[in-house]
Curated annotation (Swiss-Prot):
Residues 437-448 have a biased composition (Acidic residues). GO terms for cellular component: cytoplasm. Residues 161-246 form the PPIase FKBP-type domain. The gene is tig. The keyword Transmembrane does not apply. Its EC number is 5.2.1.8. NCBIfam families: tig. It is an enzyme of class 5 (isomerase). It comes from the Bacteria. PANTHER family: TRIGGER FACTOR CHAPERONE AND PEPTIDYL-PROLYL CIS/TRANS ISOMERASE (PTHR30560), TRIGGER FACTOR-LIKE PROTEIN TIG, CHLOROPLASTIC (PTHR30560:SF3). This is Trigger factor. The lineage of its organism: Bacteria, Pseudomonadati, Pseudomonadota, Gammaproteobacteria, Oceanospirillales. Belongs to the FKBP-type PPIase family. Tig subfamily. Its main location: cytoplasm. Gene3D superfamilies: 3.10.50.40, Trigger factor ribosome-binding domain, Trigger factor, C-terminal domain.
Length: 448
């Protein structure tokens, strides 16, 4: 076997392989003999068909079959011999396939990029320094009360924060428009869930009132025939309800799994959860800054086959997030909506893998178990979760990858200029959310 390799780009190789004619012809002859023993032809007893007849009748079909197998076998031998690291499947085409001649085929494939990591030593990374105060706990408890509030009818004018029960019908000029009517609709004023200007005109209304509300649909409204149109809604108010917050008592705190210790135990539990959330937010913010710096310092080429694989994974995730069901055909989602994000994720993954390799990082069984135990604390039956993860090789490998990723990020932070920045609990969470939002916005812009 003769092999030559041509680099057509940083990550593409064109491999030409020649297989001696004698080897091919011998393999074809052997397969024809096997065929002669097993095939049935009218006028011949099984196993007694002359080889010349078998060759005439099945020769091309057998040769195609043998050549296909030999190309697959010799492709594997060739990339092993040339120490190539393929990313995805190759495109293989025979260029010479004739009896008595050496078989020649060309395999075009993408390979993983080879590169040396550039340092991020000049990058400044902000690390939020925050703590959960008593005031933060008070605010969180108020938020929990609001989330568990009940609506109670009130005999007064509606105010922001109240809920009104209404019938409405929308008109363009004198004609009602499709989808613009509802009965018994419950609307929280100030929620901004309706067209701009609609909710504001219901402030001050009482049960039994009938109003005409004039609004203008936004220019970017999802229903194109309504975008930018002026409309009038005829509205009847049936009920005004105020929000009644529950008292922080034993009944309330039991909703959150606190059976003993009263309000003090509840506050301690809330604070513990907030501290965990804060820790995760700080970790994620620092991590994302480090990964962004790593990618900017190392703009490596990415195999298209890996981008395509990641794109399909992102499409499946999107289908799950939007509740499209297991039977949904993700091919209906355009690849271009996910391609840029997929490329970034693959690029970061390759860079992190190189950080792990260069620094000879590994994750011990104890480290994997500790991470599983940490994750399991989020569930009601942690013991079952731990057992499931540790006995499932696929899940265990995912945890190992997570541990290695964190170790790689720690190595990056050793290079970078990490600056501690004092901020409040809310500011720390907002900083993390803003960074995530900026990344999502950038993805939307590049996909637009």
């Amino acid at each position: 076997m003769q092999v030559s390799v041509e680099s057509t780009s940083q990550i593409e190789r064109r491999v030409t392989v020649q297989v001696p004619a004698a080897e091919v012809d011998q393999a074809v002859a052997t397969r024809l003999q096997e065929t002669a023993k097993n095939v049935r032809l009218n006028g011949f007893r099984r196993g007694k068909i002359p080889l010349t007849v078998v060759r005439q009748r099945f020769g091309r079909e057998v040769r195609n079959e043998v050549v296909g197998e030999m190309m697959r076998q010799h492709y594997v031998q060739a990339i092993t011999q040339e120490s190539l690291n393929p990313a995805g499947s190759p495109q293989v085409e025979p260029t010479v396939d004739e009896d008595g001649k050496d078989l020649e085929f060309v395999a075009t494939l993408e390979v993983y990029p080879e590169f040396e990591l550039n340092s991020i030593e000049n990058t400044e990374i902000e690390r939020p320094q925050a703590e959960v105060t008593e005031a933060d706990v008070d605010q969180m408890i108020e938020t929990l009360r609001t989330q568990h509030a009940e609506w109670e009818a009130v005999d007064r004018a509606a105010a922001n924060g109240d809920q009104v029960t209404i019938d409405f019908e929308g008109y363009l000029g004198d004609e009602p428009f499709e989808g613009g009517a509802a009965e018994g609709h419950e609307l929280e004023l100030g929620s901004n869930s309706f067209i701009p200007g609609f909710e504001e005109q219901l402030v001050g209304a009482k049960a039994g009132d009938e109003l005409e509300i004039k609004v203008t649909f936004p220019e970017d409204y999802q229903a194109a025939h309504l975008a930018g149109q002026e409309a009038t809604f005829k509205v009847k108010v049936h009920k005004v309800a105020g929000k009644q917050l529950p008292e922080v008592d034993d009944e309330f705190i039991k909703r959150f799994g606190v059976e003993e210790g009263g309000v003090a135990a509840f506050r301690a539990d809330v604070q513990k959860n907030m501290e965990h959330e804060l820790s995760q937010a700080v970790t994620n913010r620092v991590k994302q800054q480090a990964l962004e710096a790593l990618q900017q310092a190392n703009d490596i080429p990415v195999p298209q086959s890996l981008i395509q694989q990641e794109t399909q994974g992102l499409k499946r995730q999107a289908a799950q997030q939007f509740g499209l069901g297991e039977d949904f055909d993700v091919s209906q989602l355009p690849d271009e909506l996910f391609a840029d994000q997929a490329k970034k994720r693959v690029q970061v993954g390759l860079l992190l893998a190189e950080v792990v390799k260069v620094n000879e990082l590994d994750a011990s069984d104890d480290e994997i178990k500790a991470r599983v135990e940490e994750l399991a604390q989020q569930y009601q039956q942690p013991e079952q979760v731990i057992e499931y993860y540790l006995k499932n090789d696929e899940m265990k490998n995912q945890i190992k990858s997570s541990v290695l990723e964190d170790k790689a990020v720690d190595k990056l932070l050793e290079q970078a200029q990490v600056k501690d920045v004092e901020m409040s609990y809310e500011q720390a969470l907002q900083a993390a959310q803003q960074q995530e939002g900026a990344e999502e916005e950038a993805q939307e812009e590049t996909s637009a």
